[in-house]
């Protein structure tokens, strides 16, 4: 009996082994690597635990359950063996493969964060997202090719090919497929919301585009411009301080046009609002800087009222009242509503003074006539 046990012992041992050179005639229900009790499967090298698969199916990588995991890297299909920093996560073939000193990056998708060497706190989610970023930090790219060629910092892109271009710019935000796709050089502080918005913005800073295909033409050196509405476009290829809302409200250097993109005119320095086809409103309030702008001074004792004879002579020669602009002048230059109302009031007050004086003369004449009639 003792000899029989010794004979079958090697067979029993071989039945429980998993050969390093490969196995055949396996059955997946009974041949596997793992545990049959409620314990974790642990992987070690040099007797140091690196990976643990919990009975619940969770992966615990080089970490104690109760401690945060920012001091480790988790790499599946990406990363490399020379990575010295911590807190990186890579899932995807070719993802994060050039990393060296960068830390706390997340790369999910084929070639995501592929070129990053020393950047920190980047997130790339999608094939080729943040693929060429080398040293940039705090970027977020979500979508295939999002931030694909960008190399700057603090950029956010959501959508296929959003912020894809070869740019070193910072602080850009692109939401929507192909938004800010063509940025180059140091384009910074731009915001594009809507598919294809700022599609071909090459260079420029502090610009905003909201809407589908908004400001999508070729733009260079654009700055401080805002475009809102689907298919709304700039008036030129290098706009500065420009506004276009729905092709109805336009702005240029702080001057606004409603219904017209022409916000300039002759002798219009200092004006800020231009409205085509008129304004209809129930209430307008015009403010005056001081009392001198109104015409009450006409009633002061020292006011020099133009005699009626002189007024008649002026009208005969000039065909208009003193101080009142000619018809041609109005055609050429328009009217200042506030000043013209004050001028009209002045003329009414002067007319009132003439009427009062004439009435006094009439009363004196009536009194004299009555006296003469009584003498008779």
Residue ranges and their predicted role:
Residues 32, 37-272, 276:
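Glycine- and small/polar-enriched repetitive beta-structure motifs of secreted/surface proteins
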Residues 11-27, 220-228:
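Short, basic/low-complexity N-terminal boundary segments at the transition from targeting/disordered tails
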Residues 341-345:
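Amphipathic, non-membrane alpha-helical segments that mediate helix-helix packing
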Residues 1-18, 358, 365, 372:
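Bacterial Sec-dependent N-terminal signal peptides
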Residues 17-25, 44-49, 55, 61-71, ...:
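C-terminal intramolecular chaperone/autoprocessing and neck/assembly modules of extracellular spikes
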């Amino acid at each position: 009996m003792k000899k029989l046990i010794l004979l079958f012992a090697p067979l029993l041992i071989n039945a429980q082994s998993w050969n390093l050179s490969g196995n055949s005639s396996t059955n997946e229900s009974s041949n596997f690597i793992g545990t049959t009790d409620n314990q974790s499967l642990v992987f070690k090298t040099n007797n140091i635990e690196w990976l643990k698969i919990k009975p619940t199916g969770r992966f615990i990588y080089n970490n104690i359950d109760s401690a945060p995991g920012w001091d480790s890297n988790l790499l599946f299909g990406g990363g490399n063996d020379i990575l010295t920093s911590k807190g990186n996560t890579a899932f995807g073939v070719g993802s994060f493969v050039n990393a060296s000193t960068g830390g706390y990056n997340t790369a999910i998708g084929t070639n995501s964060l592929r070129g990053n060497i020393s950047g920190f706190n980047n997130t790339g989610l999608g094939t080729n997202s943040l693929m060429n970023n080398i040293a940039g930090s705090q970027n977020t790219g979500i979508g295939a090719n999002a931030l694909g060629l960008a190399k700057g910092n603090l950029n956010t892109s959501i959508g296929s090919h959003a912020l894809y271009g070869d740019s070193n710019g910072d602080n850009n935000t692109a939401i929507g497929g192909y938004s800010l796709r063509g940025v180059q050089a140091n384009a910074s502080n731009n915001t594009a919301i809507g598919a294809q918005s700022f599609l071909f913005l090459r260079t420029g800073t502090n610009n905003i585009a909201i809407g589908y295909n908004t400001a999508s033409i070729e733009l260079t050196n654009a700055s401080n411009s805002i475009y809102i509405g689907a298919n709304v476009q700039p008036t030129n290829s290098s706009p500065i301080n420009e506004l276009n809302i729905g092709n109805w409200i336009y702005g240029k250097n702080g001057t606004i046009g409603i219904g017209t993109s022409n916000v300039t005119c002759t002798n219009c320095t200092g004006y800020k609002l231009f409205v085509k086809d008129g304004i209809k409103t129930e209430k307008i309030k015009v403010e005056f800087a001081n009392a001198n702008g109104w015409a009450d001074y006409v009633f002061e004792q020292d006011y020099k009222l133009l005699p009626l004879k002189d007024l008649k002579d002026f009208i005969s020669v000039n065909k208009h009242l003193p101080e009142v602009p000619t018809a041609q002048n109005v055609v050429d230059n328009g009217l200042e509503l506030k000043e013209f109302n004050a001028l009209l009031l002045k003329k009414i007050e002067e007319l009132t003074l003439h009427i009062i004086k004439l009435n006094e003369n009439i009363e004196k004449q009536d009194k004299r006539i009555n006296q003469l009639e009584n003498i008779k």
